[in-house]
Swiss-Prot record:
ATP binds at K240. It comes from Dinoroseobacter shibae (strain DSM 16493 / NCIMB 14021 / DFL 12). A motif ('KMSKS' region) lies at residues 237-241. This is Tyrosine--tRNA ligase. Homodimer. It catalyses: tRNA(Tyr) + L-tyrosine + ATP = L-tyrosyl-tRNA(Tyr) + AMP + diphosphate + H(+).
Amino acid sequence: MTYQPKSDFMRVMMERGFLADCTDYQGLDEAMSKGVVPTYIGYDATAASLHVGHLLNIMMLRWLQKTGHKPITLMGGGTTKVGDPSFRSDERPLLGAEQIDANIAGMKQVFSSYLTYGDGPTDALMLNNAEWLDGLNYLEFLRDVGRHFSVNRMLSFESVKSRLDREQSLSFLEFNYMILQAYDFMELNRRYGCRLQMGGSDQWGNIVNGIDLTRRILDQEVYGLTSPLLTTSDGRKMGKSQGGAIWLNGDMLSPYEFWQFWRNTTDADVGRFLKLYTELPLEECDRLGALAGSEINDAKIILANAVTALLHGPEAAQAAEATAREVFEKGGAGEDLPTLTLTTDEIGDGISVVQLITRSGLAKSGKEAKRLIAENGAKLDDAPLTDAGLMIDADRLAAPIKLSAGRKRHALIKRAD
């Protein structure tokens, strides 16, 4: 794309690789060059924490605020009750109100690490769409809002079409999600002057619906901007690892494990991830991404430290690096490693290493743990673990032991005092 942006925000989006598509590049850029543009991203409360897959859009909101605009983080207290069908192969399980509220409380912990909330013109707002969705009158909603939507057009969106092409059913409940998200954009424009919705490229159809509805009912010019759906260079979906989701909440994934995820970045992804997930200057990102051989490991440590410091703070990043050095360079058992603490009742007369490997998260099942041992991939206190029938008693746990799966995944096992 040859367009040269006027606004700092659009320049950052283009230069650092955040931009997949925009409904009106020049119109949005012009608006952002003239004043504050309130902008929202919606987050449905499907889990108690956001994960690394959400981090790209969170960084977009951070850059938005840093370049003089107002971020709105919209919690989906209402839309979560319906479930977004975009590019899913099945219907989302429906959550109860208590679970949704608990998930929202967990999700909120992350945003204050990246955004400044308050009452100022560029201070972030945190809202919940249950505020306007829960009280809707269904018949009035159909008459006033539903009449503006063409079913033919909704069926043409790739997010819906791909599901129907696979002959997988799409419930009427899910089909309504697109209308509710469009209504969110209109309400945010009406109440808070919101002029831009951002999201992943899988949200394009939902965003366009919101733009059309806002124009039709409020006669307001609003915009949409999407980010690419990231995969790693080896084709894995961003935000997943062999051990499961990479959660952003520290109580669901320790800062050390989060740091280690970034330290294990594939060589080919380092430069790109530095641009997207850190605030290092572009020239430095390019320099670090071009390193080769053993030097690329220094770039990975810089990446891990920068990303972890943004989320968990500089001290947590430094502690994670120190733990990693102790574990990998000195063979120690760093205190910040993921830790499983067992009571004497849980240990009983002894607990098997297979159970310990599974319960510590180093394997997803007993079968996987046994295979890990059989293939010489497990270690106990840095010594090869070859006996899947080995039992660990309470005396052995008087001091912590370290279990390892491969070279990069470790956990401490401790006895409760």
